[in-house]
């Protein structure tokens, strides 16, 4: 894998320099435009780890901020009040990553938050290299591959330079696992996947596929997940907030911020009433209805041929159903109360596990449809979102509507970068086609 990464870095060196320049510009711009609570919070917990160890998992945000003092008690290093003043909900590897990152940078405050963005930007650019390795020639020949690459570029730039979130690290370890799996290094792939899950747990959806590739390699996965057991054994840590998140309890969040969540149709909280109350709102089912209709028309493309399925052994039948499993994974986004817009790309990396181009294209369309129904869900339940989740989300942009000006400039820069990259790719394709034409005519190409 290291050899592949080195070769791909050399091959894409010009584009990497360009993306790094764009990322460096985006870091201070985003820091000025957005209150990056996740980054600030991770910084606070990273510093607190060296004082309190794994017992930080037993402390709420407010308790940690009060114990750490300035600048962590300024209100921007904790999550909003509607999240119930929760404890740290991320698995162990993410905590250790930020603990090391804060240890490498002397002092607190000042440029330390930008330092965290910088590290995440480097990880994001490594992710672009890993994606290029997984796509191989498809990056130059398939339109869906270029669209996915462009989409991940914008997503990764926002998560690293504009959000300071854990997603780039999680994706990096997941992509490493997929590269190692393609190289036949199944044990190492499982170790990387285990670390990815312990950064943010959403990458667990890739575990069944990697397990089917080599069932015996699950041993390495279990060994790598021992990292999570250590806090339990040594510090008595608990992951109550993570469990509450998965159980969809109101203890995690008093708001339902997922506009696709079917529960809004039967129990939408009345945020205007002076006393706690709820009401029925049938339009909240519109996103689910559209998604179900889309899936009913498309899921049969991911089913194996009937004759092939009948003739296969029980194990081969399971393998034949892998595309269907991958296609159904994004449906879990409808099950949780807390789903933010960028969660749509959480399962983007699964696209590399499809062997057929038509399956990958269909999967990309599914993610697009989910993004559409997410937006439609906000409009369908506008009275609820207008009086609660949306104002709280917009509050993270201190400049208000004026934040759109530099934001549009950054989007414009991203479009220009993609245009330059696409232009060079087209020139390479034209050059390659001309060489083939000359060779077919029997001409000598020097």
Model-derived segments and their meaning:
Residues 118, 195, 227, 330-331, ...:
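Hydrophobic residues within the alpha-helical transmembrane core of Major Facilitator Superfamily
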Residues 355-446:
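Aromatic-enriched
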């Amino acid at each position: 894998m290291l050899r592949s990464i080195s070769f791909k870095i050399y091959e894409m060196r010009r584009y990497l320099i360009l993306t790094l320049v764009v990322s460096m510009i985006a870091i201070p711009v985003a820091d000025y435009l957005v209150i990056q609570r996740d980054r600030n919070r991770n910084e606070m917990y990273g510093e607190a780890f060296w004082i309190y160890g794994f017992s930080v998992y037993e402390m709420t945000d407010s308790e940690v901020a009060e114990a750490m003092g300035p600048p962590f008690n300024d209100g921007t290093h904790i999550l909003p009040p509607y999240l119930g003043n929760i404890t740290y909900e991320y698995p162990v590897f993410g905590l250790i990553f930020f603990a090391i990152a804060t240890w490498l940078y002397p002092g607190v405050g000042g440029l330390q938050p930008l330092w965290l963005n910088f590290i995440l930007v480097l990880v994001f650019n490594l992710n672009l290299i890993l994606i290029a390795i997984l796509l191989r020639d498809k990056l130059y020949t398939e339109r869906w591959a270029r669209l996915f690459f462009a989409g991940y570029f914008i997503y990764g730039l926002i998560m690293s330079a504009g959000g300071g979130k854990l997603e780039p690290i999680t994706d990096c370890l997941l992509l490493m696992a997929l590269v190692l799996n393609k190289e036949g290094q199944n044990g190492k792939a499982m170790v990387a996947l285990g670390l990815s899950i312990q950064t943010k747990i959403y990458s667990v959806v890739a575990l069944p596929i990697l397990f089917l590739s080599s069932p015996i390699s699950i041993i390495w996965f279990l060994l790598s997940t021992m990292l999570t057991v250590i806090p339990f054994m040594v510090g008595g840590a608990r992951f109550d907030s993570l469990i509450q998140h998965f159980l969809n309890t109101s203890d995690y969040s008093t708001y339902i911020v997922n506009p696709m969540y079917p529960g809004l149709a039967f129990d939408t909280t009345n945020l205007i009433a002076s006393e706690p109350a709820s009401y029925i709102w049938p339009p909240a089912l519109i996103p689910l209805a559209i998604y179900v209709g889309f899936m009913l028309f498309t899921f049969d493309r991911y089913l194996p041929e009937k004759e092939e399925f009948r003739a296969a052994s029980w194990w081969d039948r399971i393998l034949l159903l892998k595309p269907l499993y991958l296609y159904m994974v994004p449906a879990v986004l409808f099950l949780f109360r807390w789903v933010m817009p960028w969660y749509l790309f959480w399962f983007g990396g699964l696209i590399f596990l499809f062997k057929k181009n038509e399956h990958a294209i269909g999967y990309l369309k599914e993610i697009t449809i989910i993004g559409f129904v997410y937006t439609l869900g906000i409009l369908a339940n506008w009275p609820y979102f207008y009086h609660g989740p949306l104002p709280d989300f917009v509050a993270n942009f201190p400049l208000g509507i004026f934040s759109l000006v530099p934001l549009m400039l950054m989007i414009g820069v991203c479009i220009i970068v993609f245009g330059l990259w696409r232009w060079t790719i087209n020139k390479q394709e034209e050059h390659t086609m001309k060489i083939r034409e000359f060779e077919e005519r029997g001409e000598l190409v020097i």
